[in-house]
């Protein structure tokens, strides 16, 4: 998933603002919220670093976002210490 945020005139002379945080002009390999971005005077273009699991046992498993790894973990509802098999992500 990717998006673009157009910078308002005079919004910042030092970089781009995303989710209340200032990022410098240029390439940002990872934001606080797990996006890879490019910041220019005109706009900020970002894409997610994570893929959303869609193919897994939804009855026995649940999805939990892991901000440290910038990915979704799919774990057993009964025992979250055990991972579930995921056969497709988008």
From Swiss-Prot:
Q: Which UniProt keywords apply?
A: Amidation, Disulfide bond, Secreted
* Name of the protein in question: Beta-microseminoprotein
Residues recorded as bearing Valine amide in the entry: 90
The text of the family note is: Belongs to the beta-microseminoprotein family.
Q: List the disulfide bonds.
A: 2-16, 34-70, 37-46, 39-47, 61-84
* Compartment annotation: Secreted
Species source reads Struthio camelus
Give the CC-aspect GO terms: extracellular region
